Amino acid sequence: HILDLTAGKTEAAKQISASAFIDACQLLGDAQSQLSGVAMHSATKSYLKKLNLIETERDSTDVEFDTYQGRRVTVDDGCPVGAGGVYTTYLFGNGAVAYGNGSPVGFVATETDRDKQTGAGIDYLINRKAFILHPRGIAYTGAKRDHVETPLRTELAMAENWKPVYESKQLRIVAIKHKIG
């Protein structure tokens, strides 16, 4: 699900706003209540804070956290900023991204090695781990893939390599492409 505000006719229509955020939630229809968090660039958060739209709450253990329209805010400058100052903000639901251990083809998780020529010898125990983050409800097909071992970031970014396997409303990730004032 993508709401691209940058196609707006005026500069104001291209900027993230409270009503645009509601429009993004509406892309999930009656399943929008599943959206529990929002990840945004720090510049986006600062812009929304200037508009007095970010609220700071305190939980029962006295820990403060920010919310936007009732959804917990995660700030990460790794959120994309494209040409012309186009930011991408993500809404997501609990469990929208799966985390697991991977075992790629040819992957050797544990092995030993020995350096016989150093002192009395040095033994090495080598452990490798492969971690996987994957959006739930979308299958990676690898339809356009040149790299043999693992897909490259450019290959992961290609829409042709992904196929939805869940009903559209069950995909609990929404991207908002926008500008800030």
Please provide the spans of the model-predicted regions:
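Long, hydrophobic, well-ordered secondary-structure blocks that form the structural core
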Residues: 1-8
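Structured, hydrophobic secondary-structure cores that serve as assembly/anchoring elements
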Residues: 1, 18-52
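Sequence/fold signature of self-assembling virion shell proteins
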Residues: 11-16, 23, 49-181
